[in-house]
Amino acid sequence: MKAGRYIGVMSGTSLDGVDVVLAAISNKLVAQQANHFLPYPQTLRQRILAVCQGQPVTLHELGLLDAQLGELYAKAIMELLAKARLSAADITAIGCHGQTIWHEPESDIPFTMQIGDNNRVAALTGITTVGDFRRRDMAYGGQGAPLVPAFHLAVLGHPTEKRIVLNIGGIANISLLLPGVAVKGYDTGPGNMLLDSWNWVHNQTAYDDNGQWAATGNVNTQLLQEMLADPYFSRSAPKSTGREYFNTQWLHYHLAKVPNVFPEDVQATLVELTAISIAQQVQLNGGCERLLVCGGGAKNGQIMHRLASLLPGTEVSLTDKYGLSGDDMEALAFAWLAARTMANEPGNLPSVTGASRETILGAIYPTNPR
């Protein structure tokens, strides 16, 4: 792997904005040096959300979103560089994930689609950009996700300790770092996505701060069991999912079967859905000594409390304790994956994605010679 400074750019299924991180990366070291967050303008967020939920969209609108996101990513990167007092010449490459608008790994012809024009990112920043990370893995029969477990293994793996890394973003996913066993990782189900959507409808705020609203409600057992009966939760790995499946339509389908539930009780039940669907998968894999949590859901005290209660004997802690910011974990991972791509090294783990082989991920968008 070519040592240098890399920038990772991530906008996840929560659709809150763009996380950008600067890291010094070498073979054995990932050292975060700066970070920046640029929120999505509300109108842009709503347009992306409409596409992600399968609402009809014209090619003109899709192309416009692709271009606008590319420009927004470039703006976030330049703001990060200004904060760090660095120039484009100081950066080896950018790893830009893009915004997933559809992910369908189980169809007859599996595909995934991310937007955010990397040509614009490279042109506007003057920095070589690596993007389109997921489709090469899919071309070899994989799910195209999750890709972050390879990074988790590199930076959080332990020779003797059973560890599981849990990322609670819009979707929750786990990386199983078990000594002597090939790494596995997959999406467990909803993370913050349904919680945020339901909270927005009733409180018009982006998220339920620390789970305070959920704490005022009571879990509706009938609704919880109805949702947990969804076949996704019992499906074997490898598996991945997204907003195209676990969305407001999915929630209302289940609410129609259990009517007249108070809004705060729905929120409390969604917290329990997230926590139980995670805990069940931890237990299914034999448990662990440490559950290392990152992502926005790590700030939800209700989720963290329920995880600790559901997993007695497991230390539930934040990845920040190990020097890796939970807010920036995925952006760091794509900076690391960009470094691997630039060095012609594979970035996927077939034991995680189900691909038939390891492969170099992504496409490189070189900048013009200086």
Curated annotation (Swiss-Prot):
MF term (GO), any: kinase activity
Reaction catalysed by this enzyme: 1,6-anhydro-N-acetyl-beta-muramate + ATP + H2O = N-acetyl-D-muramate 6-phosphate + ADP + H(+)
Pathway, per record: Amino-sugar metabolism; 1,6-anhydro-N-acetylmuramate degradation; Cell wall biogenesis; peptidoglycan recycling
Assigned keywords, A-Z: ATP-binding, Carbohydrate metabolism, Kinase, Nucleotide-binding, Transferase
EC number(s) on file: 2.7.1.170
SUPFAM superfamilies per UniProt: Actin-like ATPase domain
HAMAP family hit by this protein: AnhMurNAc_kinase (MF_01270)
Function recorded in the entry: Catalyzes the specific phosphorylation of 1,6-anhydro-N-acetylmuramic acid (anhMurNAc) with the simultaneous cleavage of the 1,6-anhydro ring, generating MurNAc-6-P. Is required for the utilization of anhMurNAc either imported from the medium or derived from its own cell wall murein, and thus plays a role in cell wall recycling.
Recorded family membership: Belongs to the anhydro-N-acetylmuramic acid kinase family.
Name of the molecule in the record: Anhydro-N-acetylmuramic acid kinase
Species of origin: Proteus mirabilis (strain HI4320)
